[in-house]
Structures are given as C-alpha cells and as structure tokens.
C-alpha cells in the first residue's frame, strides 16, 4: 500500500514504536524508532557509510539533513555542532515526531524538525548531509535536489550517499549536468556498495576537490 511507504506524509499503519541502541558521534545512545519510517530496525548501511565519510560539520549556521527519517544524521550533526541550527527535513510526519522525541530524550535543543514547506525560504545552509529517498522515483528525486542544493552557502559542501546499484553514478552525472557552473560534484568515497558524492558551491572555493573513481 502506498500509505506504508516511508516517503508518505502520513503512514497509515498503526504506530508501533521500538527502542534501539546505537552509537552516534561517539556517544552510546538509546533511541526510539517506529514502523512506517525508513530503516526502523537500525541505522542503515548507506547512512553508516555517509557518517563515516564526512568531515566534521561547520560549528555554526544552519545545517541540513534532507530526508531525515527518524534522525540519525540530524542527531549526529547536532551533537557535533551544538551551536548550529540543524534542520531535519522530511515529508513523513511520523519520522519528524521521532526526531523530536529523540532530540528531547538526548537533551538536544538545536534541532528543528520540519516538513519542506515549513522551512523558511530565506534559510540557507552551511552543509547538507543526505541519504536521499532514491525510491521516490527519478523525477521526484531530481525535483527535490533542484530545490535544496541551491540553498547551500558559497564555498560549502553537500554530501549525498547513494547505493551504486540504485544509480549513484547516473545521479552524479545528472548533478554535474544540472549544476555545471555553480557547483562542482565529485565522487568522494566508495564503500560497501555505496558512493558518497560531494558537491561544493563554486563561489568561495579555496582548493581542489579530490575524486574517487
């Protein structure tokens, strides 16, 4: 049923929460997840690869977790950058409720969990970390990235993790073709069948970006 997709705004299934224990930003934590969201049993492999690949986030400003699910990326950003404002953005209201609950449980005050339309249009980001919802379909995914990638601040980076057999390299080519002048996209790393793509807004670039083939 479409209502059961993790990218649905309001999952139709009865809420069934669970507690998982995991490690985020060097902290052993106990978090709440639920059915009707992405990877409720554990931190999925793609997100693990992303979190192991990215450098420390900027210490301040607005940071974005695009397609946040129950919140492992957003919570990591908030733990590593306690003086920043972390936007956890998802269409799934159940996922956003879980992000809020987990942030409260961990006494994290600097996360704003919001649907896309509730992020003010004038907010721009010092970094974007995302395990994007590939299964929404190519057109929806492209529309999503075309909306949010341009909200990156000059000289700042977006980090996307995509499974290779779900089109990471074709997405890389699309990003290069869609943002040929303003952004530089490269393959930053490859691990466990996933690519981590890095996109830097060209204005303010201070050096070369490495590439992994």
Which residues are covered by each model-predicted region?
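N-terminal auxiliary segments of SAM/dcSAM-dependent transferases
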Residues: 1-25, 36, 40, 212-213
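Conserved SAM-binding loop and adjacent beta-strand
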Residues: 34-52
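Conserved SAM/SAH cofactor-binding pocket of Class I
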Residues: 46-130
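Short beta->alpha hinge that forms the Motif I/post-I loop of the SAM-binding pocket
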Residues: 90-92, 140, 163
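A short glycine-rich, Lys/Arg-flanked "PGG" loop and its adjoining helix->strand segment in the class I
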Residues: 142-154
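Conserved beta-strand signature within the Rossmann-like core of class I S-adenosyl-L-methionine
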Residues: 155-162
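Conserved class I S-adenosyl-L-methionine
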Residues: 163-180
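Core SAM-dependent methyltransferase catalytic element
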Residues: 189-213
């Amino acid at each position: 049923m479409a209502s059961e997709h993790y990218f649905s705004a309001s999952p139709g299934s009865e809420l069934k929460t669970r507690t998982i224990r995991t490690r985020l930003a060097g902290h052993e934590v106990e978090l709440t997840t639920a059915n009707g969201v992405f990877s409720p049993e554990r931190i999925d492999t793609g997100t693990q690869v992303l979190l192991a690949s990215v450098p420390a986030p900027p210490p301040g400003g607005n940071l974005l977790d695009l397609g946040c699910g129950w919140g492992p990326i957003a919570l990591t950003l908030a733990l590593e950058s306690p003086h920043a404002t972390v936007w956890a953005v998802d269409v799934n209201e159940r996922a956003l409720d879980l992000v809020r609950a987990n942030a409260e449980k961990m006494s994290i005050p600097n996360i704003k969990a919001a649907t896309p339309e509730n992020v003010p249009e004038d907010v721009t980001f010092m970094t974007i970390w995302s395990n994007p919802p590939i299964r929404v379909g190519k057109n929806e995914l492209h529309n999503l990235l075309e909306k949010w990638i341009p909200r990156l601040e000059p000289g700042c980076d977006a980090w996307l993790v995509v499974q290779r057999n779900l089109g990471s390299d074709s997405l890389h080519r699309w990003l290069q073709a869609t943002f040929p002048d303003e952004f530089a996209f490269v393959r930053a790393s490859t691990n466990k069948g996933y690519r981590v793509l890095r996109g830097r807004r060209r204005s303010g670039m201070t050096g070369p970006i490495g590439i992994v083939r």
